[in-house]
Amino acid sequence: MSRSDLDGLGYRGKVVVITGGASGMGEAAARLLGELGAVVHIADIAEPTVACASFTRVDLADPASVTSATVGLAKIGPIDFLFPIAGVPPHAVGALTCMLINYVGTRQFTESLLPQVRDGGTVCLITSTAARGWLHHLAENLAIVALDPLAVGAFYEANPDKLRDGYSTSKELLTVWIHQAAIALAEKRRIRLNGIAPCATGTPFMEESAKVLGQAFMDAYPHPLLGRMPSGEEQAWSLLLLSCPLNAAVTGAVLATDEGNVGGMITGALTAAYVQAR
């Protein structure tokens, strides 16, 4: 099937801004969007290899860099789809920087560009199966989501025990923010805000994780039903299908794209020795 046969997904000619388009799921999403006829603007710390309408360098851990990038991107005109999906594992940058990139910078980037998103537009983020404890920590997560995002780093510097590994915490906060912020965006501007929550996926992210976690961890990782890690492109399709206008009734949702991992863990249908209470 050619990409032109998929025009019904509604991306042809639409303006898209995406972070993380230089690698992994972000690269796959940016490439697919281009093939679907979208006008793709990529923001990342590394220059992408995928074709795009423009590239803006941004360090999501640096608020000044985020401000500079979003001021520039605001000039491209109304945005139809916003995909702030860059993310890093904690062992690559440390727990605090992981938090700054995955939650603080991502939320700052998103909120800075929301005025440029068309009424009726769509925003979609990437959380993780690592956020499965978000309800268990709901009161704490709500309190932190209520903070100015730029104050969150200082909060965790003063309370390092609450940071945990930085990754699961950042993804829990994104999950809570999606559920909460979607309400006002829908009521006031008919903007849909959703997320996907992938399991371990065959991307450079997991290649780096394997170096730290070890092959035994990777061999023991449960891959129910499919028997393998999904690819970055498979996760990107979930992101794009959830965000397309055919799913106009869906907002405030976090779609589990995890081969049944979290549901299996919650119900006891799936057990894994490495899973610890969070």
Residue ranges and their predicted role:
Residues 2-7, 251-278:
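Short C-terminal tail/terminal secondary-structure segment
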Residues 3-41:
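Canonical Rossmann dinucleotide-binding motif of NAD(H)/NADP(H)-dependent dehydrogenases/reductases
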Residues 19-20, 79-87, 121-128, 194-198:
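Rossmann-fold scaffold of SDR-type NAD(P)-dependent oxidoreductases
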Residues 51-64:
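Rossmann-fold cofactor-recognition segment
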Residues 88-92, 119-187, 200-202:
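Catalytic loop of short-chain dehydrogenase/reductase
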Residues 108, 166-167, 172-175, 195, ...:
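C-terminal helical subdomain
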Residues 197-208:
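Short, flexible catalytic-loop segment of classical short-chain dehydrogenase/reductase
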